[in-house]
Amino acid sequence: ARANARQNIADSHQKLALAGMKKDIVAVKIKLRNNEELSKEENSIYLTYFSLMLRARENQHYQHKIGMLDEDEWSSMLISFKTLFKEPKHLEIWEYIKITFSEDFVELVDEQIRQSQIYGQDSA
């Protein structure tokens, strides 16, 4: 069952990675890296993409809570949160959409953001 959970997570990551390679998403990522303003359409596209990314992370959180995700995989996910939230746009989107997530996931994400802001990106 654990192997199946891990495979499902890997499949989900692969789908998100492929979605992140689509032209419209790549264009938005480039604009974000260059600190360029996004159009309303680009904001909408990226909001959807980032929301899906967080839903996948919420699923990982759930899998960990029920014992289906091992500690190594969980630790990797927590570290990746710190990288994910280095992008100011991600923080902006999170503040906007976090009310749509489970309370314990919101607490987890907010704590990871707080830790990375206090201790820097290398804290785990």
Summary of predicted features, one role per range:
Residues 42-124:
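An amphipathic alpha-helical interaction surface
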Residues 1-44:
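Membrane-proximal alpha-helical anchors
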